Amino acid sequence: MSEKKLASDYFMEGLNCAESVIKAYNEEFGTDIPIRVASGLGGGCAVGNLCGAVNGACICASFAKGRDDIGQENPAKTYTKKIMQKTIEHYGTTECKSLKKDRVGCKEIVDFSYEVLKEALK
């Protein structure tokens, strides 16, 4: 049996930060969120804004807890809020360029975001 990969392992293999979180979620939970939905989100949407790893975690939470149609309640917001709050509590920001300025490595935030996602969904 092979050892379970960390989200950052996928990052080191060439996926961007957001794609890596989604790939790890798919592998652990047997889902099939298309990786391509996150292809433009790495590097803070390529301009240093919302961290791609955090964004990827929010995509997974929305997939797991989101609504399917107009008029339905939207519980996904509760979960994405938890992800955002935990990240801000820990790092003081969710902004990619600020995280990098503070020398937070992408591998670190990818694994952190994935763990926060799993904790939020419990």
Task: Name each model-derived stretch.
Residues 1-26:
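Active-site-proximal helix-loop elements at catalytic-domain edges
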Residues 5-13, 40-49, 98-103:
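A short glycine/serine-rich beta->alpha loop
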Residues 16, 59-62, 104, 108-111:
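Mg2+-dependent prenyl diphosphate-binding active-site environment of isoprenoid biosynthetic enzymes
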Residues 22-40, 88-91:
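Acidic-glycine-rich active-site phosphate/pyrophosphate-binding loop
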Residues 23-27, 59-66, 115-119:
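Short glycine/serine- and small hydrophobic-enriched flexible loop segments
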Residues 28-37, 62-79:
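Phosphate-handling active-site elements
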Residues 41-63:
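Glycine/serine-rich anion-binding loops at beta->alpha junctions
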Residues 75-122:
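C-terminal binding/interaction regions
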